[in-house]
Design a protein with these regions (language model features):
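N-terminal secretory-pathway/extracellular module detecting exported/lumenal segments
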Residues: 20-141
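Positively charged n-region of N-terminal signal peptides that target proteins for export
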Residues: 1-4
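Bacterial N-terminal signal peptides
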Residues: 8-16
Length: 141
């Protein structure tokens, strides 16, 4: 019995250590007045000499105000459940200064996934001057 308890404790410690090692390290990128943006500094992937994959987290500066705005226009047919945060996988081509979105996942604070969208074909857009994407470009390119 003692060996079983010791094995369970050891497994829990391994799981805890594994979760800690793979936790995202979010660094503040910018704020827009409505949203706050962070990027995961530990998971920047250089896919080629000019292409970078980044994980971007978006939260609200004042979620209650945004929620009140959405609920003002919601009806029974189109009720809106506002996420607490979203995680996007972005791809930036540094040479051409373009950005595309690979996926977006919207979450509740509990970790429950509200919506997940994966894009098979990435549509790239030029990075506008002064945008969140330019701030991200400046960090990783």
């Amino acid at each position: 019995m003692r060996k079983v308890i010791l094995a369970v404790i050891l497994m829990l410690l391994i799981l805890l250590l594994n979760a800690t090692l793979h936790a995202a390290k979010w660094e503040h990128l910018a704020s827009s007045g409505v949203y706050v943006y962070y990027y995961d500094v530990d998971n920047i992937g250089y896919l080629s000499e000019v292409t970078v994959q980044i994980i971007l987290k978006q939260t609200y500066e004042d979620k209650d105000s945004v929620n009140q705005f959405y609920q003002k226009y919601a009806t029974d047919e189109n009720s809106i459940e506002l996420e607490d945060y979203s995680i996007s996988t972005m791809v930036i081509n540094c040479a051409d200064k373009i950005v595309g979105i690979k996926s977006i996942i919207s979450y509740k604070e509990s970790g429950e996934v509200l919506l997940q969208t994966n894009f098979n074909n990435i549509n790239y857009l030029f990075i506008p001057s002064g945008s969140i994407y330019e701030a991200l470009y400046d960090k990783v390119c």
